[in-house]
Amino acid sequence: MRRWSCLAALPYLLSPAYAAGLGPSSGEPVAPAVSERASSYSHWLEERSMLQQARVLARHYSGNSIQWQHPYGQPQPHAAVARASVWFTAYPASTIAASPGTSVISTLAEERLWSAFQAIGIQGIHTGPMKRSGGVRDLGYTPSIDGNFDRISFEIDPAFGTEAQYKAMVAAARSHGAIVIGDVIPGHTGKGPDFRLAERAYADYPGLYHMVQIEPRDWGLLPPVPAGHDAVNLTPAAVDALQKKGYIVGQLHSGIFYEPGVKDTDWSATDVVRGADGVQRRWVYLHYFKQGQPTLNWLDPSFAAERLVIGDAVHELAVLGDGMLRLDANGLLGIERDPTGRVWWAGHPLSLTANQLIADMVRKLDGFTFEELALPLDVMREMSRGGPDLSYDFVTRPAYDHALLTGDAGFLRLVFQLMREYGIDPGRLIHALQNHDELTMGISHFAVHADETFPFRGGRLTGKELRELVRREMYDRLLGERAPYNLKFGEGVASTTATVVAATLGIRDLGALKPGDVERIRRLHLLLAFYNAMQPGVFALSGWDLVGALTLPAASVRERLADGDTRWINRGAYDLLGSNPQASQSAGGLPRAVALYGSLTEQLQSSDSFASRLARLIRARAQLHLQSARLADVPAVQAKGLFVLVHELPDNTGLEITAINFGDRAIDESVPIRGAATGSKAIDVLEPQAPPLDLGPDGRLQLRLNAFAAKALRIKDPVSP
């Protein structure tokens, strides 16, 4: 450990000598005078920093009665779902503008688009991050390195449009009874003005980040920074050496975005930076994700991170007009070396506290939040007690894809049983098809509960064994010669929903698809939409889903894949309305993806299209008020491909049965339906003209499903109208 104790040094830290920049932690002693140019640059950075923008914004709300108009201390999942229960999740960089010169935001504000959304039943648009991102070098901005998930300003990214256009989009959504859903990224920023000021030890900016100043005598532990770069990733040996010196907590047991030679650890070192006080320093900083995404420090005496993130949330709600916010990567807000010596970073209690603060502030201003991070069920349960209102369904997402790929819904049934044991309400989950990320198969609950045993396929497996089995079966079917159009990424697969389905069907060559193949893909795609829509909570789908996008050829985005981020193949550009057929790429430079289903304009003219069938499904969901239902049972079944959910509809209006055959063979099975009265009849919600089914005296329902088919059945009490 370092010999210099911070407590013993406290009197020295408060001394004039230290304040002048001459202390042992200040680097090389220099004259205290700071050049006018350096001071001017610091002020230039500060004016553009998010922390400064948060300070200015806070003045308008501190002491204002607006803070006391809404309840905020507890999550309000049902109120959040009532505000918008069907979402379109946009990805700005993939959006093809309506016409040359039209911005992405103006494209998303078009009346024709919102008319199409309303026809489908979409009630909210999650824009994805739209604020300026990337970094700052000297007086210029550098581009985003992670799809605008490296935010550096509260300003709208000029590549997407303007603040005025954003507000017009909000107005367009509201005129169609919908909301706009924005983003806050509480775990990290890009290398913008805030980080550059932190490097320069300016004011309280170093308190923003999990960054540690390294004594000049220990600079030998740090590798040199390559020419043209501003930081260098540390080797495991360097991390261990710094940990032994007492600088950092050390290596994390598993890394995100691990790529040999690119990201060997979650720690990087800056080059020598001359500070605002003229002192030269080198820093080591934490970044769970890419090197250009330094991690915020949520427990620093300056409380700078809290001020920045909450200021960003206030800006989204009060200035831009968003009705809900995503908290991205919100489970990585605390880190320490625990008493056993283990580095504790996932599911840290500080994350719970931080999420509570953000979610409370958002609810204070009449907004709602949702989290988007794959968490174990026990952590989700703790988070639901005081944090975000909704959670992204990373729990059943890999499970339902596993069911489709294998024709065996056993793992999906097990996951639902565990959710019930942990008290996870599906009504507070966002059940989604594709999003901008890979199909994640981290299956985190079983990784954390690696030694616990679970029933599966007639035996018992440890969490580790079960996780490995499920992942192996999915990888075998989604990658390699069987499906060369998908690529591995991290603990998942870069794919679109359409290419997951294609792999399920054994289609290897996407360039040789015939009309019959497209129809089969569309049919199974709708089956997955049915699974997600016919549950309580939020149903979300993307632009790639709406047009039936295929993955991009890797060669077409080769430069973007250079750092190992293969997700760019599942982010191809799409033109929702077909307004700009000549465009070969989006404004963000992504090539146009092959769209199997065509534009929404084309699809809504055909009753048999994906969008039109989807609209009928969403209408049925709305008529049942299924978004507000309660999961009552997950019946045991015999056929391995059969999956059944029993929901209690709100206001005592009966039961709804969601029945899906994930297998390639027809099913005819009698299933027990708890809570159904003798003599009740089951009506097919999507085909009401079909003869109703009778429940037997033993409360069992005979389900007949073709291969890859589903039914939604409503059961009313015999005396109900």
Please report, for each region that a protein language model flagged, where it lies by residue.
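Bacterial N-terminal signal peptides
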Residues: 5-16
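Surface-exposed beta-strand/loop patches in extracellular or lumenal glycoproteins
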Residues: 662-678
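Acidic/aromatic-lined carbohydrate-recognition and catalytic surfaces
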Residues: 23-306, 315, 332-406, 412, ...
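Solvent-exposed beta-hairpin/edge-strand motifs
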Residues: 673-689
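An active-site-proximal structural segment forming one wall of the substrate-binding cleft
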Residues: 304-324
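Loop/helix patches that line or flank the sugar-binding groove of alpha-linked glycan CAZymes
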Residues: 423, 429-656, 662-666
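C-terminal beta-strand-rich structural cap/linker in extracellular carbohydrate-active enzymes
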Residues: 695-721
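Boundary at the C-terminal end of the N-terminal hydrophobic targeting segment
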Residues: 17-21
